[in-house]
Amino acid sequence: MQIHIEPISKSRIDQVDFDHLAFGRSFADHMLVAEYADGAWQKVTIQPYGPLEYQPAMMSLHYGQAIFEGMKGYRSVSGDIQVFRPEENMKRFNKSATRMCMPEVPKEIFLDGLRTLLKLDQAWVPAKEGCSLYIRPFMFATDEYVGVTPSTTYKFIIFNCPVGSYYSKPLRVRVETEFIRAAKGGVGFAKNAGNYGCLLYTSPSPRDTERSRMPSSA
């Protein structure tokens, strides 16, 4: 499948402090965008990273047909870019897609598209020890419709973030005894958006470390 490339007019890389990288706050110049409609994958484009415009009735906002993956690219001693297990990430991504009634993304879009994207944005892969390029493939339903049924159109996107360590200090472990994320027969194995949104209530955040807990009978 042909990939159309629309290069950015001026890179934003000089705006990033690669010596002090936060996780998930800086984004590389380009993103890969593929569209699914009429039962097949259509146009595939690499374009400047930027906003997307959708209608309020877009189905993924209401019914949760949204999945994602995460992997990392590293700069080797020789300067090459190496990605850890991209084929396995693609398999898991498509397993999530099947569970959420979404189309699988073919290898020529997922892997070949990623390879082309990394080649274009290779300057964004950090060389500093402990840093990497976080790669985020994701897909979401785009039909404009209010009703519980699988969408007929989807968007698949890959964007990249130069990152430092995910955690800035050692972890403290808390065992949750009241709330669960997964249940037998459910979607706990899938990397769908709802699996992570439901965790926020049980995860203390800097904004609300003393949040109240809902009664277990609620």
What are these regions (language model features)?
Residues 196, 216-218:
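Intrinsically disordered, low-complexity segments enriched in polar/charged small residues
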Residues 211-213:
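Basic polycationic patches enriched in arginine
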Residues 201-208, 218:
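Conserved small/polar residues in nucleotide/adenosyl-binding loops
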Residues 1-200:
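Conserved alpha/beta cores of soluble small-molecule-handling proteins
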